[in-house]
């Protein structure tokens, strides 16, 4: 489920490859996971940005990274991130619909930057929300980030200059 903000704007071939990697990480095809990830990608593309929620998988990853911090190794890092991706597939991670009045425990808001391409070349990401935020706050944050992302795209395409 990682990198959905990039995948949502990619060609169908890349979307299918992303879905296949998710199934491979789980060891077998999972219809429910497939539908969940497809809905997430459709929502991200329609809305123009990705919202991820705080999860137990994220908390476990943070703990694992703290444990290996002083005795860092590639094998331990690979194990921690693989477990994170595996666990994430079991949780409600991508916010599909935003209710302006509801409160959400947001992990990240990601807005794609297209620059001169049809697919994102990078994303602006806001994270480290330590309190719940409302759907309307998410929309406001994303709107401001999108304005900046659109400006970077115009600058990269030569449609605007730095003043």
Model-derived segments and spans:
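Short, solvent-exposed recognition segments
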Residues: 1-102
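Residues in flexible loops and secondary-structure boundaries
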Residues: 14-15, 27, 116, 121, ...
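Juxtadomain coupling helices with adjacent low-complexity linkers
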Residues: 77-107, 120-163
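A short, hydrophobic, proline-anchored segment that marks a local hinge/packing element in signaling
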Residues: 108-117
